[in-house]
């Protein structure tokens, strides 16, 4: 359930601003929509602490401090760590530059540029060139040019000359570097020594990661405090703030305001207010979806639906059908058991894993799929659990493979039709209560979707369908959508009718899209079959190894089924989540563009 929110305006004496902010943070129920930027010093410090945290992760070991350092003790450590990281960066850049320069000089051998500069100071302006054999011969024959032949560099004749050569000769001059190869190598070695020193310090500093995390949290809280402080407005000795609170917290706010002697006003959010935060109230069942929503980073809009219950139900079924193997479900169940025993209390994510594991085992048992092994059907108990027309090995039950595939595909289309029809019913219910005539358009969509289901069966499965009544229902649904799709409480009947007729072509395209939406649920069948085929392929590969090569067979099974599980989990994200977030949510008209309710309070965890 999405909790109702109230807009609250809070006014206090300007001299009480700090007390106001402190009390609001302690209260922890007011959400501020448009906040000003936090003080730059807090933002810069948090960014630096984040960089330190990332840098020290690679040095983190088992031994860590038992308690964070005090603020006073942390500051010298913070400065020393910042200096060390800056020094490490400089040394790495210097080492890279020295290595690259030394690499370029490798073919020139080890020489001292300093000695060449000393010769130049004594009047010997030496220039080094590379050229071809013909030019080298011409230079040697020129009485006006004095050259010294050097060893070839890069298979090209090389020479030294006193003073620059005339521009008439095609030669490439070698610029004398500031440092020789030997000096550069020594410089690189010095950098390595400095980096080892930095590494030793960072290894020791990694033990203080808890202190860094503690300071990150404090800095983040300070940044939020300064942001709210900067958001407040003041005039004539008064300071005021505007935010949102859950309606259920209104009485608690009023008591706190009376104790603090604040002036306040409370009202419902305006109809066009798009900054209202969304606070979803979960029950014991729907809270299982929190980890999924957190991973996806989606929040329903304040005026949208809370579909967490339906999302959980369909997501669980989609997960089971996509993974499709009871053996894999047993592995997930074992993982859930281990995590539960290890933590002694199952987190929400682990509870969700329990549910998904059991659902996968049930679906796999109904289809007779156990690690892709056909031999599992020789076990009477496992065989007795199978629904024959759902069986992935239909020959064991006297069912033709075409019949089995058509049954699964039909089940997928039924799921799609039920889910999309549910969305229409939810829209009808809400709009009917709001006296919004566009509920008739959703009734039209309901009729069209249910009729299009039979069209899908006719085209995909080849089921005999009387298309004339189906076409009539689709046309009737189309007309209802066109006539009433533009209606809304703030429009007259004529205005709504005009808007609906103007969108007739769009409705036509959306009707075709509705057909495609039902068709898209076939992905559950396709991905499940692909997963089974992959499992069978690896099983057959492993069967080819016997005797001493049985170890190779075990490796093939572990790697093959491991990859299949990973691909299945990715498919759940790509396909299972998509059907909920796009097809189902699209039919509901949800955009998932909500703003998560984030009240002003002192957090005990770092916000990402």
Segments from the language model and where they lie:
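Long, charged N-terminal accessory/stalk domains
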Residues: 1-310, 339, 346-350
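Conserved, carboxylate-rich catalytic/transport cores that coordinate ions
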Residues: 1-6, 18-32, 251-608
């Amino acid at each position: 359930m999405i909790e109702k929110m109230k807009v609250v305006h809070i006014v206090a004496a300007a001299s009480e601003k700090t007390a106001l902010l402190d009390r609001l943070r302690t209260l922890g129920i007011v959400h501020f929509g448009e906040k000003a930027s936090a003080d730059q010093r807090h933002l810069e410090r948090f960014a630096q602490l984040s960089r330190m945290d990332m840098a020290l992760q690679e040095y983190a070991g088992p031994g860590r401090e038992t308690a964070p350092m005090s603020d006073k003790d942390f500051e010298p450590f913070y400065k020393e760590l910042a200096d060390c990281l800056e020094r490490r960066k400089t040394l790495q850049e210097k080492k890279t530059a020295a290595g690259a320069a030394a690499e370029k000089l490798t073919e020139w051998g080890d020489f001292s540029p300093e000695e060449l500069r000393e010769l130049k100071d004594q009047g010997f302006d030496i220039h080094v060139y590379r050229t071809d054999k013909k030019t080298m011969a011409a230079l040697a024959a020129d009485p006006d040019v004095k050259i010294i032949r050097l060893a070839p560099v890069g298979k090209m004749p090389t020479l030294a000359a006193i003073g620059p050569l005339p521009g008439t000769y095609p030669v490439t001059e070698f610029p004398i570097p500031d440092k020789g190869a030997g000096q550069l190598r020594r410089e690189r070695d010095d950098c390595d020594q400095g980096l080892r020193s930095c590494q030793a310090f960072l290894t020791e500093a990694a033990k203080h990661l808890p202190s860094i995390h503690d300071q990150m949290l404090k800095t983040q809280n300070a940044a939020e405090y300064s942001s709210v402080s900067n958001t407040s407005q003041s005039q004539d000795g008064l300071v005021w703030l505007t935010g949102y609170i859950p309606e259920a917290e209104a009485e608690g706010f009023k008591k706190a305001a009376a104790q603090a002697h604040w002036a306040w006003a409370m009202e419902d959010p305006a109809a066009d207010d798009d900054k209202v935060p969304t606070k979803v109230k979960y029950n014991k069942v729907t809270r299982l979806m929190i980890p999924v929503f957190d991973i996806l980073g989606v929040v329903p809009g304040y005026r949208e639906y809370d579909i967490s219950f339906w999302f959980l139900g369909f997501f669980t079924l989609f997960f089971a059908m996509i993974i499709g193997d009871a053996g894999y479900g047993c592995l997930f169940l074992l993982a859930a058991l281990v995590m539960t025993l290890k933590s002694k209390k199952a987190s929400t994510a682990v509870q969700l894993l329990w549910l998904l594991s059991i659902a996968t085992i049930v679906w796999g048992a109904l289809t007779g799929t156990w690690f892709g092994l056909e031999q599992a059907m020789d076990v009477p108990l496992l065989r007795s659990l199978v629904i024959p027309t759902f069986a992935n090995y239909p020959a064991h039950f006297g069912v033709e493979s075409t019949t089995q595939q058509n049954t699964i595909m039909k089940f997928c289309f039924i799921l799609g039709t039920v889910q999309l029809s549910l969305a229409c019913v939810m829209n009808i219910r809400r709009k009917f209560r709001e006296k919004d005539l566009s509920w008739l358009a959703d009734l039209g969509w309901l009729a069209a979707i249910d009729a299009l289901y039979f069209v899908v069966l006719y085209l995909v499965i080849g089921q005999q369908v009387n298309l004339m009544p189906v076409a009539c229902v689709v046309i009737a649904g189309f007309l209802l959508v066109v006539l009433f799709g533009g209606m809304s409480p703030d429009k007259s009947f004529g205005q709504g009718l005009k808007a609906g007729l103007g969108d007739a072509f769009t409705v036509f395209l959306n009707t075709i899209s509705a057909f495609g939406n039902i068709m898209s649920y076939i992905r559950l069948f396709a991905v499940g079959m692909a997963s089974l085929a992959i499992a069978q392929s690896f099983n057959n590969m492993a069967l080819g190894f016997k005797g001493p090569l049985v170890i190779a067979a075990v490796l093939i099974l572990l790697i093959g089924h491991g990859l299949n599980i990973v691909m299945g989990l990715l498919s759940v994200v790509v396909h299972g989540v998509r059907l909920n977030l796009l097809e189902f949510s699209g039919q509901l008209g949800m955009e998932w563009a909500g703003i998560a309710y984030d009240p002003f309070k002192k957090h005990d965890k770092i916000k990402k």
